[in-house]
Amino acid sequence: MLIYKCLYFRSFLKVIHNLRIKSSFNREPITEKSILGTELLFLTKKQDRMKNLCILILVSFFISCQEKSTNPDIALIQKAQLIHMKTLTLDTHDDINVKNFTDSLNYSMDTDTQVNLPKMERGGLDVAWFIVYTGQGELNAEGYEKAAANAQAKFEAIHRLVDQYEPNKIGLAHSRASLDSLRKIGKRAAMIGVENAYPLGENLSEVKRYYDLGARYMSLAHNGHNQFSDSNTGEFDGSTKHNGISELGKRVIDSMNYYGIMVDLSHPSKESIRQTIAHSKAPVIASHSSARALSDHPRNLDDEQLEWIKEKGGVVQTVALALFVNKEKHEKYKAAWEALEDKTDTLALEALKKKTPPVDISDFVDHIDYIKNKIGIDHVGISSDFDGGGGVEGWKDASETFNVTLELVKRGYTKEEIAKIWSGNLLRVLDEVEAVAAQLQAN
């Protein structure tokens, strides 16, 4: 540690010098806000985290000497920063558009997307699960062919990111071991989830091909019933197709268990979820769902479903999508925002937020609290649904990821609990799914 302190002491002095100049000019003391504003703590490479840590220690020492501050917020923020830097942060649901994966426009740049590498670096997000999503179409050869082409284009886009656009900064991970390997060489990780098994058609050999392309979770359905499963959208009109999952759906689950792909429960109907859990030989996940007790929406999970997932050894990745976090609060804010005449008027927008607050990060973490209290700390995780409708005040994009850790620290979560919530629980399930696959393949 002393060696690192010596190596980076000049950097520290430069930061403090700049802060002193700013402080002197503004006639304000150096505070946590001035430090946070330097982007000091989230440098752009994972291998720089030791530098971050050393500078943080020196800055903390400087503040204590300068102010003898009694402000508890400073200590809380510093504690959260240390935890955030040491924790593997993983978001299980980030949608993509292939238009953002070209030579001239891609995630190596700070695009207007909610997730890209610069935003991940600024927010300290280590792992993004990029989603191969296809909307539900007709259940015929033409529909399957079109969906398969859509899915293939998204697989290829993700591979271009890690192979061509930013191979020195991000790699494709398939397991905990490959994640660890990427971390050791200072890279962030992309992982792949498939949202809607519809593009498989009726060709179950595609499950193996998707696995080989990097898919490590897949949902049987999305918005609309398909050849494998009923969707939770049937709750709106009372419709079903299979009264759960079809025989073909059971065979897809068997294939996913065999190869080591986690079964995702976030879009199928309640009866489909019950039957899927009963049929699967491996634990399951809900990649982006929250607690229905707090926000009554079919995409969320009721207490009975939460218990089913716990009993199966699975994990619920709480989602930061405003409608699913607090339906009533979101609808009130949305109505007020739509009534605003000039939506570019910053002052009017701030006044609106004070009068009619939007769904925020505190509301989101309420769901983590609820699920933790209902089924235990080992069965809850985090997802954003960024670039697919997700985002709440305080976590509007990947650059604000630290705020989630800060809110957890404010609520008294320990560093061990935060590590489980951010990635430990999800990776435990992935490990167990891989173990089941190895056993099935050995028999």
Enumerate the language-model features and the residues they cover.
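Proteins with a high burden of low-complexity, intrinsically disordered sequence enriched in S/T/G/P/A and R
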Residues: R10-F12, K22, K33, S246, ...
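Loop-centered beta-sheet repeat module
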Residues: H242-S289
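N-terminal hydrophobic targeting/anchoring segments and the immediately downstream early-domain regions
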Residues: Q66-T240, R292, D296-N443
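Bacterial Sec-dependent N-terminal signal peptides
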Residues: C6-A75
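Short alpha-helical patches at coil-to-helix transitions and adjacent helical residues
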Residues: N52, K270, A398-T401
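Generic signature of intrinsically disordered, low-complexity, basic-rich segments
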Residues: R27-E28, S34, L40, L76, ...
